[in-house]
Design a protein with these regions (language model features):
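A general structural detector for well-ordered alpha-helical segments in enzyme core domains, enriched
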Residues: 1, 33-34, 60, 64, ...
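Acidic, low-complexity intrinsically disordered segments
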Residues: 1-187, 191-195
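Radical SAM enzyme core and accessory elements
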Residues: 13, 35-45, 383-516
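Glycine-rich, histidine-containing beta strand-loop boundary motifs that form or position
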Residues: 20, 53, 81, 103-104, ...
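Conserved acidic residues
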Residues: 47, 98, 198, 260, ...
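Radical SAM [4Fe-4S] cluster-binding motif and immediate context
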Residues: 139-295
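Short acidic (Asp/Glu) and glycine-rich catalytic loops that position anionic groups and cofactors
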Residues: 165-168, 195-200, 354-362, 393-396, ...
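A structural motif corresponding to the C-terminal lobe/cap of the Radical SAM core domain
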Residues: 211, 224-231, 238-243, 247-409
Length: 516
């Protein structure tokens, strides 16, 4: 949208509309809205709809295009985005569309639209996207509406590309990283901030690659915090974990709680796996930097691990999970390997007997080291981990779930055992209410693990009330006495109340790190 005038024409920009949908919107409603926006075509007039196609919307977009073409056969459909930029000819969505731009579309999409409208007509269906110098790309931020700024997390980019070659990632295909000129970019951020934007998510693959630029961006937001209207500022960056120079640490340490969030891809601590997938990561430095961030900064850490990588076993993944958990980040995202189109991870398919779903999101279903049942078992555990650990609803109770039941056990296996039991009792990973989860945790800790009922109930009570839920789990059905502004059981023992108060105080002091 932002480049339709610069690389097309002023007239083209004026004739272009940007329409966004959610996956929840019925497809017939999307068709009606799109065709209504275009209006009835005049004789000889070309009408164009472009779609950004991703792993998460390709199925719905394929069906949407089929409906559009059935209702208006002369419509020109142009595709772009990562899902159609690789293995292009094999895809149904490509076969039913008119043109595909692979790679960058900032310049190529306006040029293609101008050709379709004014001629000469393009000869090729698949068009390799032109990658211009970044100073030839118009930044899009002026097109953000006031509604966007007031209600949305804003995606911004200070750079594109990535110099690293992790084989599961599409960015591994980039030759390097390219940075936008910093002064104009910061001016755009200032304008957005003055218009009321407070939630910024940087989509740069490696924010802390160029430290001088990182420092200036962090300083920009730090300066905003001195202004009277800085309430609600939240800034999210994706960082590599083993590159945190003192210059960067000094600024990070100045941020107050609730402002800075880092997404930190660990993926695996297994050095053999790291080499197989061309991932360069200093594990010792990674751990040291994570520990520094937790102890010396107020940054919220969202860390990632990937299950199913070639060469990874269940036991080796468990070791990596326990190592990361012991460091204490606020979140650990447990992902499943996906074979994204075009990624070099495909080169391991035969040697490691990798079997993937043939439908999006193309998750791995079996490897030489992980059978199908183990993959299913872990997938369930990952969903329960989100519901219990990453949700923040069980801050006091989670350490009990993670505490090894024996010296031969570990936190990973403790939670896996809970996940196995929860699956056996419910046979579902979706639709579990907060109350059902509270009762499941209570039963596991008191019946399976044999922990003291009153101590477990006190923890769950505090967790449940703090979560803001207002129903009544069975294990807390009688809790009615006042406790710190809330209510507990009138028949609760003094020991229960004292334990709950003590645990709440401990929670306030130590925050919500996953390892308690």
């Amino acid at each position: 949208m932002a480049n339709m005038a610069r690389h097309g024409s002023t007239d083209l920009a004026g004739r272009t509309s940007l329409i966004e949908f959610t996956l929840a919107k019925p497809l017939p409603d999307m068709v009606s809205q799109l065709l209504s926006t275009l209006g009835e075509p005049l004789r000889g007039q070309v009408q164009i709809i472009g779609f950004g196609v991703y792993i998460w919307n390709v199925v719905q977009t394929t069906e949407l295009i089929r409906l559009l073409k059935a209702q208006r056969p002369g419509l020109k459909i142009v595709l772009g985005g990562p899902e159609v930029s690789h293995e292009t000819d094999q895809q149904e969505i490509v076969q039913i569309s008119d043109h595909v731009i692979t790679g960058w579309g900032d310049v190529s999409f306006p040029k293609l639209c101008k050709q379709l409208l004014d001629g000469p007509q393009p000869l090729m269906k698949v068009i390799q996207g032109e990658q211009p110098p970044l100073d030839q790309i118009e930044l899009p931020y002026q097109h953000f509406s006031d509604t966007d700024l007031a209600n949305r997390l804003l995606y911004v980019e200070a750079s594109r590309g990535c110099p690293f070659k992790c084989e599961f990632c599409l960015s591994s295909l980039d030759k390097t990283a390219w940075a936008f000129e910093l002064a104009p970019f910061l001016n755009e951020l200032q304008t957005l901030y003055q218009r009321g934007a407070r939630n910024f998510k940087f989509v740069d693959r490696t924010f802390n690659l160029k430290i001088e630029a990182s420092v200036q961006i962090l300083q920009f937001f730090l300066n905003r915090l001195t202004e009277p209207d800085a309430d609600g500022l939240l800034v999210h960056f994706e960082v590599i974990p083993d590159h945190l120079p003192d210059k960067l640490k000094a600024l990070i340490a100045l941020y107050p709680p609730g402002v800075l969030q880092f997404e930190v891809g660990i993926q695996s601590f297994n050095e053999t796996v790291q080499k197989l997938i061309s991932r360069r990561q200093d594990n010792v430095q990674t751990e040291a930097n994570l520990r520094w961030l937790i102890s010396e900064s107020n940054a919220h850490l969202h860390t990632d691990l990937i299950f199913g990588l070639p060469g990874e076993t269940l036991d080796s993944f468990a070791e990596g999970f326990d190592r990361l958990l012991a460091i204490g980040p606020q979140e650990i995202q447990l992902g499943i390997l996906k074979r994204l189109r075009g990624t070099p991870i495909a080169r391991h398919t035969e040697a490691f007997e990798m079997i993937y779903d043939d439908q999006p999101p193309y998750v791995v279903r079996q490897t030489k080291d992980l059978d199908a049942e183990t993959l299913q078992r872990f997938t369930r555990m990952a969903k329960y981990w989100d519901l219990v650990a990453n949700s923040g609803r069980f801050k006091l109770s989670l350490p009990f779930l993670l505490k090894p039941a024996s010296p031969q056990n570990s936190s990973f296996w403790s939670f896996m055992n809970f996940a196995d039991e929860l699956w056996q009792r419910t046979s579902k990973t979706y639709g579990l209410t907060p109350e059902a989860l509270v009762d499941a945790v209570f039963m596991h800790l008191t019946e399976t693990r044999g922990l003291p009922v009153e101590e477990v109930r006190a923890c769950l009570l505090q967790d449940y009330v703090a979560s803001g839920a207002r129903a009544r789990p069975m294990c807390l059905a009688q809790e009615r006495l006042p406790l710190g502004g809330h209510v507990v059981n009138p028949n609760a023992t003094d020991a229960t109340i004292a334990t709950a108060q003590k645990l709440r105080g401990r929670q306030d002091r130590h925050g919500s790190n996953l390892n308690g």
